[in-house]
């Protein structure tokens, strides 16, 4: 009787899997060995003889020091940032000390000077004409022109230019007109000594600064934010500034303090030659036992915002008011 052939091993037979996986290894060994798998009898790791190990340097994080950065990208970023910062300071936000005007204000005054014939001209016309010097849109030109009109020194307005006391906005540029004041005509312009440079597109010429004989920086005041710095100079009284100029020429002492178009009571004890700050409060008159009249308000505050704050305090029970007119 013939013997039955042996049963063919299946994948479920561990010995069959072991026999299949055995291949000649390095140095004539067949199959995986404890050394090649990195496991020893004691459970400790061991490197295979045919694997080369190298020591890798560990990188330690250090705080970034800009002074030590010298790469090409860093130099490019530094250069571009400085160019942008210088542009914003010179050409947008900060006034020049020589004439006290920001670039947009100077370009508005120069446009009015070139178009001046003594008559009123539409604000929309001046805004469009000024855009050949100022490439930052008509809105910024129109807003700056309205501010100059409300200062009442350099530009005379005709129409609704808003109200600093009530906070009302100006009418549309096509409905209002303006022209230079006589003070601006005589004290700001002198074509013979005005240095001109090409405009932003090279098609026109505009002044570097105006040969102003007035301390406009103190007359108008300014507030601007640039890259890395800001400027805020409070406005001053025009006759007091002229008296101060005369005192300087005569080598006499003088005292100049800020002055605001809306009035108010000012505490200037901390104000010293532009350093420190002033505190301005509303000026109140007691008419009778039950009536208080607010005669003057601080700068930056309008009658509408003041009424709203009084009504809010009344609703919260902080203030008792019978009527508000």
Each predicted region: which residue ranges?
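Gly/Lys-enriched N-terminal cap/neck module of very large, oligomeric protein machines
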Residues: 277-325
């Amino acid at each position: 009787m013939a013997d039955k052939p042996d049963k063919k091993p299946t994948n479920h037979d561990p010995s069959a899997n072991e026999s299949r996986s055995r291949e000649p290894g390095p140095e004539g060994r067949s199959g995986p060995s404890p050394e090649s798998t990195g496991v020893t009898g004691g459970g400790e790791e061991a490197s295979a003889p045919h694997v080369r190990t190298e020591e890798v340097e560990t990188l330690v994080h250090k705080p970034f020091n800009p002074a030590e950065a010298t790469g090409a990208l860093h130099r490019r970023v530094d250069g571009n940032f400085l160019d942008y910062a210088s542009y914003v300071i010179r050409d947008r936000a900060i006034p020049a000390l020589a004439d006290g005007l920001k670039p947009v204000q100077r370009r508005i005054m120069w446009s009015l000077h070139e178009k001046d014939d003594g008559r009123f001209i539409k604000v929309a016309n001046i805004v469009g004409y000024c855009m050949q010097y100022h490439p930052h849109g008509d809105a910024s030109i129109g807003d700056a022109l309205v501010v100059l009109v409300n200062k009442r020194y350099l530009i005379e307005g005709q129409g609704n230019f808003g109200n600093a006391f009530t906070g009302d906005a100006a009418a549309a540029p096509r409905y209002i007109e303006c022209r230079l004041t006589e003070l601006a005509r005589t004290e700001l312009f002198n074509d013979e000594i005005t240095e001109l440079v090409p405009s932003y597109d090279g098609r026109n010429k505009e002044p570097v600064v105006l040969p102003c004989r007035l301390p406009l920086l103190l007359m108008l005041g300014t507030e601007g934010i640039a890259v890395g710095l800001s400027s805020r100079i409070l406005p001053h009284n025009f006759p007091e500034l002229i008296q101060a100029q005369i005192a300087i020429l005569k080598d006499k002492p003088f005292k100049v303090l800020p002055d605001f178009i809306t009035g108010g009571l000012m505490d200037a004890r901390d104000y010293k030659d532009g350093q420190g700050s002033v505190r301005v409060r509303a000026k109140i008159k007691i008419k009778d036992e039950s009536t208080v009249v607010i005669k003057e308000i601080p700068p930056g505050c309008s009658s509408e915002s003041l009424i709203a704050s009084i009504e809010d305090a009344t609703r919260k029970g902080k203030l008792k008011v019978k009527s508000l007119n």
